[in-house]
Curated annotation (Swiss-Prot):
It is found in: Cell membrane. This is Elongation factor 4. It comes from the Bacteria. It is a peripheral membrane protein. Its EC number is 3.6.5.n1. InterPro entries: EF-4, EFG_III/V, EFG_V-like, EFTu-like_2, G_TR_CS, LepA_C_sf, LepA_CTD, LepA_IV. The gene is lepA.
Length: 603
């Protein structure tokens, strides 16, 4: 049993690319958890996709033994956190499991938007924050400027800031000493009823769901009967583990320690991030605070290109759901695309990652429909309904008002790009809140934006207009009334359900025109004329025609009588008329993708 005074639980907070995973690698190597031979880059990012994109998606952990300068041996638990805004709830639970945090800032870049968001979250959890200025080996590094920025923007004392380079290994000992000296040891009575916070879980095909947790009070042993307080489910602990990146079995874990357990749990939905574990025969009176169910913010339809793959897609989604309880899906059918699923995600990166994993790990070809946010529709009858699929949009005459989700966005950018970025936010129906100067060269802009407007290519536009220098972070703040309408696309007079989208009334005309022009280029020509129309209700906003292909029926007439020619042309016209009445139009897959990339400013 480890003396509580010798345990330190900490995490690393950093913006993407500021060197968080590399720093974790160096600390693991420095404390000798893994030998040089066993080390791989980014030990804690085990998903191929995480390494490739350089992002951490699932929180991982490692336990390190370290003999400090005072001669005592300490147990340091590093809990790796995802840094991206979509996974904010996972970050908040991982932070709740710690007492301290290393704030890693790139010496050449300074503070970025996501760093700020996570620092404020760490301060809310009363964590002791140790600033680490990383990448000091870079020629462009300016540690003094970054120190000043940290002091001015966040208000942290940087006299204890550590200069480090995770790449070359400079400053690792200083970081570990700072963790021992500044991060407070965990508190908590080992004899009290068990209360442990779940901060992650993953599915193992042999052992079932493996639950990662941090114990706040009490003790858990192998063979105990445990209860999850949010779901009320009970299980018997088969095995307990600590992390030496891999799972290493132990007999018991007590207050202050971080570990994992296997209890033959078959479904990940029983294990919810943020829930409290207690003992069934001696339960705690109150769960730990802060648990909430993950609510999907973005919905999209996923359809297999080959209809026979429907079963495989369902199995793949079920497998992914085992590791990711925030993914929700239900079957849906579309006239244009056949059978598929309506999936809910935490945000756009989450959607992107899941889609890429489906295509890569399960070898599926997918068509995605345009992503939608959840609208709140107040009906004239007084009831309120939530709509995430344009197909379920009610009859306009029965709608009293519509509310859409809005976010508070924070954009950190060099001063010379403020103009183009403000213009971008105005275009996206943004409301300017305020702006603050971080130093003479960088500004933090605050905007209120509709979530639907940052869904498609806002991030790409942001990077384009700031030449890649701006960083962006947002939090959903609630719902606000908005004038939203459903826009249908009619091809050959028939509405195509998969192309319908919900847009703001003011933008409907512009978007409708851009969309029909795009579809005109993508839908192949037929033997009869095909009109493409964008409509809101009964009003047609834009129309384009696809000209028909025609056979030259006069080719064999040479000279000949004009009446003969006329007869052949009339006959052709009759045939076209009949064809137009019964013909069906092929819509290629690219046409569905066009909805995703329609930017009215392109043409």
């Amino acid at each position: 049993m480890v003396d509580q005074r010798h345990i330190r639980n900490f995490c690393i907070i950093a913006h993407i690319d500021h060197g968080k995973s590399t720093l974790a690698d160096r600390l693991i190597e420095f404390t000798g958890v893994l030998t040089k031979r066993e080390m791989t880059d980014q030990v804690l990012d085990n998903m191929e996709l995480e390494r490739e994109r350089g992002i951490t998606i699932k929180a991982q952990s490692v336990r390190m033994d370290y003999v400090a300068d005072d001669g005592e041996q300490y147990v340091l638990n590093l809990i790796d956190t995802p840094g991206h805004v979509d996974f904010t709830y996972e970050v908040s639970r991982a932070l709740a499991a710690c007492e301290g945090a290393l704030l890693v800032v790139d010496a050449s870049q300074g503070i970025e938007a996501q760093t700020l968001a996570n620092v404020y979250m760490a301060l809310e959890h009363d964590l002791e924050i140790i600033p680490v200025i990383n990448k000091i080996d870079l020629p462009a590094a300016d540690p003094e400027k970054v120190k000043k920025e940290i002091e001015e923007v966040i208000g942290l004392d940087t006299s204890i800031a550590i200069l480090a380079s995770a790449k070359t290994g400079i400053g690792m000992k200083e970081i570990l000493e700072a963790v021992v000296n500044f991060v407070p040891p965990p508190k908590g009575d080992r004899r009290a009823p068990l209360r442990a916070l779940i901060y992650d879980s993953f599915y193992d095909s042999y052992k079932g769901v493996i639950t990662y947790f941090r114990i706040f009070e009490g003790t858990v042993r192998k063979g105990d009967r445990i209860r999850f307080m949010a779901t009320g489910k009970e299980f018997i602990v088969d095995e307990l583990y600590i992390f030496r990146p891999g799972l290493t079995p132990v007999e018991e874990l007590t207050a202050g320690e971080v570990g994992a357990l296997a209890a033959t749990i078959r479904e990940v939905k029983h294990v919810r991030v943020g829930d409290t574990i207690t003992l069934a025969d001696n339960p705690a009176a109150e769960p730990l605070p802060g648990y909430r169910k993950a609510t999907p913010m973005v919905f999209t339809g996923l359809y297999p290109v080959e209809t026979n793959d429907y079963g495989r897609l369902r199995d793949a989604l079920e497998k992914l759901q085992l590791n990711d309880a925030s993914l929700s899906f239900e079957p849906e059918t579309s006239e244009a695309l056949g059978f598929g699923f309506r999936c809910g995600f935490l945000g756009l990166l989450h959607m992107d990652v899941i889609q890429e994993r489906l295509e890569r790990e399960f070898d599926l070809n997918l068509i995605t429909t345009a992503p939608n946010v959840v609208y709140r529709v107040n009906m004239t009858s007084g009831e309120q309904i939530m709509i995430e699929n344009p197909a379920n949009w009610p009859d306009p005459s029965k709608i009293e008002s519509v509310e859409e989700p809005v976010v508070r966005a924070s954009i950190i950018t060099p001063t010379e790009y403020v103009g183009p970025l403000m213009e971008l936010c105005q275009d996206r129906r943004g409301t300017f809140l305020n702006m603050e100067y971080l130093n003479e060269k960088r500004v933090n802009l605050h905007y209120k934006l509709p979530l639907a407007e940052i869904m498609y290519d806002f991030f790409d536009q942001l990077k384009t207009r700031s030449r890649g220098y701006a960083s962006f972070d947002y939090e959903v703040t609630g719902y606000e009334p908005s004038d939203m309408v459903k826009m249908d696309i009619l091809v050959h007079g028939q509405p195509v359900d998969a192309l319908s989208c919900i847009v703001h009334r003011e933008k409907a005309q512009k978007l409708g025109r851009a969309l029909v022009q795009k579809l005109r280029k993508l839908i192949p020509r037929h033997l009869f004329e095909v009109p493409i129309q964008a409509a809101v209700g009964n009003k047609i906003l834009a129309r384009e025609n696809i000209a028909p292909l025609r056979k030259d029926v006069l080719a064999k007439c040479y000279g000949g009588d004009v009446t003969r020619k006329r007869k052949l042309l009339e006959k052709q016209k009759e045939g076209k008329k009949r064809m137009k009445a019964v013909g069906s139009v092929e819509i290629p897959q690219e046409a569905f993708m066009a909805v995703l990339s329609t930017d009215p400013d392109e043409d």
